A protein has these predicted regions:
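Phosphate-coordination loops involved in phosphoryl transfer and adenosine-cofactor binding
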Residues: 81, 130-134, 205, 214
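Phosphate/diphosphate ligand-binding glycine-rich loop within oxidoreductases
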Residues: 41-115
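NAD(P)-binding Rossmann-fold cofactor-contacting core
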Residues: 152-169
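Short, well-ordered coil/turn residues at beta-beta hairpins
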Residues: 7, 46, 65, 192-195
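Short acidic low-complexity segments
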Residues: 28-39, 50-53, 169-185
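N-terminal glycine-/charge-rich "phosphate-binding" loop or analogous flexible N-terminal tail
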Residues: 1-40
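Rossmann-like adenosine-cofactor binding region
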Residues: 164-216
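Glycine-rich NAD(P)-binding loop of Rossmann-like domains
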Residues: 113-145, 172
């Protein structure tokens, strides 16, 4: 009986090896199970075509191999009664936080100008942009990790989430009024919101107009 089914397009042999190190007795399959799909209990998916899970009628859990589950939830044939889990991988969180920090510092020190026109802009002549407040929309696993990194480097961090949250050294806001507060006071705005029906198109022109002049 195959207990765990891995996607064939995401380094399945490495995943299989790691899982077997944790549980040598685990029965693992790779790719679509055609002979006995009813015996599959757990699946790992990522950006799967709609209907991929149709044959697996006895699933106990679905794991999305990423931090967002929007690709799975968009499948109209996703079994509604089966719990869905997502990864909370510290390495992936660090990569995202470093990317965000790089983007903020590149803008703050006007590095793009130096890269595009190095011969016209003497090194050190650009003005350091003012503003030290980073607003983070979405205080989940990724948002919290990013907040910690910005705090370590002396940034002031404001965060917004749908429901109330408390994070050390972070000014936390929630709800519509809280969103307006973060939008209108952030020098740098970062969105780490999950893509759902409630967050899609949240940052529209109306929201952008609430941001302070010169915000990035």
């Amino acid at each position: 009986m195959i207990q765990l089914l891995l996607p064939e397009h995401m380094q399945p042999q490495e995943l299989r090896k790691e899982r077997l190190e944790l549980d040598p007795g685990l029965k693992i399959g790779i790719g679509p199970e055609k002979e006995s799909p009813e015996k599959v209990e757990f699946v790992v998916i990522w950006n799967q075509p709609h209907g991929t899970l149709r044959p697996y009628r006895n699933l106990k859990a679905i794991c999305v191999y990423g931090h967002g589950v929007d690709s799975a939830l968009q499948d109209p044939e996703l079994p509604k009664e089966v719990p869905i889990f997502r990864l909370a991988d510290q390495t992936m969180a660090l990569w995202m936080s470093e990317y965000l920090l790089t983007a903020v510092l590149m803008h703050r020190r006007q590095m793009v100008m130096h890269i595009r026109e190095p011969e016209n802009i003497p090194w050190g002549r650009t003005v350091r942009l003012e503003g030290n407040r980073v607003g983070i929309l979405g205080l989940g696993f990724l948002g919290q990790d990013a907040a910690k990194l910005f705090l370590k480097l002396g940034f002031e961090v404001w965060g917004w989430s749908r429901s109330p949250k408390t994070l050390a050294d972070v000014s936390c806001f929630h709800g519509n009024e809280g969103l307006d507060e973060v939008l209108s006071n952030s020098d740098f705005l970062i969105s780490l919101l999950p893509l759902t029906s409630e967050t899609e198109n949240l940052l529209d022109l109306k929201c952008m107009k609430k941001m302070k002049k010169g915000a990035y």
